[in-house]
Amino acid sequence: TEYVTLKNLEVLDKWVSLSSNKYKGTVKRSVWLSEAGTCSPSYRYNDLQDQAAGFAYGWKKINNLDGIDGIQWHSWFDHLGDGVPLGLRKYSDEEYKGEAKPVWTTYQKAGTDEEDDYFEQYLERIGIKSWEGLIQDIP
């Protein structure tokens, strides 16, 4: 794809590591994925699980790429005007009341001692056997 996505973050990691893209050729520039996230097209179980699995996948990649410093999630709550529900929680309206989505708990476990055990549930959904080998080599 011509766009940087969670699936091809290695391309951005490679780009930022090139001396031609470093400050004065030697200092790595900070790269933060901001206003980023995965969405749940609906509040159906599978869509919510896909969103959480997508976050887990991205988190594991980001933390294994030296060129990417972190991710700033797009929004805590889904917003009707956004066009896609990227929030960690559902709409904060009378119907949904900002209820936590599965991605909320996944986000909470990220970077803690519970991360590996909790994230394991998403391996099959993503279609991989382990997090090993998640990072692709970019020539």
Residue ranges and their predicted role:
Residues 1-45:
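Noncatalytic carbohydrate-binding groove/subsite architecture in carbohydrate-active enzymes
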Residues 40-139:
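Aromatic-rich peripheral "rim/lid" segments of glycoside hydrolase catalytic domains that contact
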